[in-house]
């Protein structure tokens, strides 16, 4: 696979070519995903739960993300890598710049931050320094206490309008990509069509430019109850490779997510 760039992802949006993304945290899985043709990998702070065994993403530190980014880059040299800035690692511009440098040096193409209007100044400073930025709105796990738990966001009209306004403001301020998590399908469609940057959905219906899943959910190895928007692709396949290929196919052909995976 040739190196994936932000320009290529933007062209896919223009040409309405959907793409599949996935989380990964180590060399072996990132190499497998890359060999299957996954173009985008997120080194997510979800590792706090899937790798470290915590009950939330909040304990994850910047050093954890840097370590796992290095491992993933070795396994996926040509894949577009997005790395999370974890909780309280970007509380002001100085801290954001310092920690972004750590992550980019570790091999990421892009950093991701959760939040809306309060991030504008930080986004502008990073963008002025030519750093690629992915925004993340809707259900933002780093703020699940404030949100009252892991709930669908944007169901009410005023909440939906707020998310639309935030998405437009984030793009205007300099983000290069946006993740929408757990919002109604119609709202995600409207936001996706309103932005010129690629929009990736998780639990937000099929009308975004791309889809992302946590690898453990996709492979059916998450213990306990999983979110309703996830799908166990391994249960329908006889190998991990075939499960990933099925995931890619279903995303590219708008089969997944179906209505039962959407809100």
From Swiss-Prot:
Its EC number is 2.1.2.11. The active site is at 181 (proton acceptor). It is found in: Cytoplasm. GO terms for molecular function: 3-methyl-2-oxobutanoate hydroxymethyltransferase activity; magnesium ion binding. 3-methyl-2-oxobutanoate binds at residues 45-46, 84, 112. It catalyses: 3-methyl-2-oxobutanoate + (6R)-5,10-methylene-5,6,7,8-tetrahydrofolate + H2O = 2-dehydropantoate + (6S)-5,6,7,8-tetrahydrofolate. Pathway: Cofactor biosynthesis; (R)-pantothenate biosynthesis; (R)-pantoate from 3-methyl-2-oxobutanoate: step 1/2. Pfam families: Pantoate_transf. GO terms for biological process: pantothenate biosynthetic process. Keywords: Cytoplasm, Magnesium, Metal-binding, Pantothenate biosynthesis, Transferase. Its cofactor is Mg(2+). GO terms for cellular component: cytoplasm. InterPro entries: Pantoate_hydroxy_MeTrfase, Pyrv/PenolPyrv_kinase-like_dom, Pyrv_kinase-like_dom_sf. Mg(2+) binds at residues 45, 84, 114. Binds 1 Mg(2+) ion per subunit. Belongs to the PanB family. NCBIfam families: panB (TIGR00222), PRK00311.1 (NF001452). Homodecamer; pentamer of dimers. Catalyzes the reversible reaction in which hydroxymethyl group from 5,10-methylenetetrahydrofolate is transferred onto alpha-ketoisovalerate to form ketopantoate. This is 3-methyl-2-oxobutanoate hydroxymethyltransferase. It comes from Buchnera aphidicola subsp. Acyrthosiphon pisum (strain APS) (Acyrthosiphon pisum symbiotic bacterium).
């Amino acid at each position: 696979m040739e190196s994936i760039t932000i320009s290529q992802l933007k062209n896919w949006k223009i040409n309405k070519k959907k793409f599949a993304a996935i989380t990964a945290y180590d060399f072996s899985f990132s190499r497998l995903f890359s060999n299957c043709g996954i173009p985008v990998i997120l080194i997510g702070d979800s590792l706090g739960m899937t790798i470290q065994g915590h009950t939330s993403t909040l304990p994850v530190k910047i050093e954890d993300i840097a370590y796992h980014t290095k491992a993933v880059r070795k396994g996926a040299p040509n894949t577009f890598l997005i790395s999370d800035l974890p909780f309280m690692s970007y509380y002001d511009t100085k801290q954001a710049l310092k920690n972004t440098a750590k992550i980019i040096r570790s091999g990421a193409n892009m950093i991701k931050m959760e939040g809306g209007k309060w991030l504008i100044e930080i986004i502008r400073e990073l963008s002025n320094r030519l750093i690629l930025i992915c925004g993340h709105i809707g259900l933002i796990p780093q703020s699940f206490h404030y949100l009252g738990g892991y709930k669908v966001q944007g169901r009410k009209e005023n909440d939906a309008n707020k998310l639309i306004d935030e998405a437009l403001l984030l793009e205007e301020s300099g983000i290069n990509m946006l993740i929408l998590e757990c919002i109604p399908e119609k709202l995600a469609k409207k936001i996706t069509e309103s932005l010129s940057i690629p929009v990736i959905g998780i639990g937000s219906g099929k009308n975004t430019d791309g889809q992302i899943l946590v690898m453990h959910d996709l492979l059916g190895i998450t213990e306990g109850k999983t979110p309703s928007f996830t799908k166990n692709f391994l249960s329908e396949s006889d190998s991990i490779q075939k499960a990933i290929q099925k995931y890619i196919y279903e995303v590219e052909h708008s089969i997944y997510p179906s209505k039962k995976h959407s809100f």
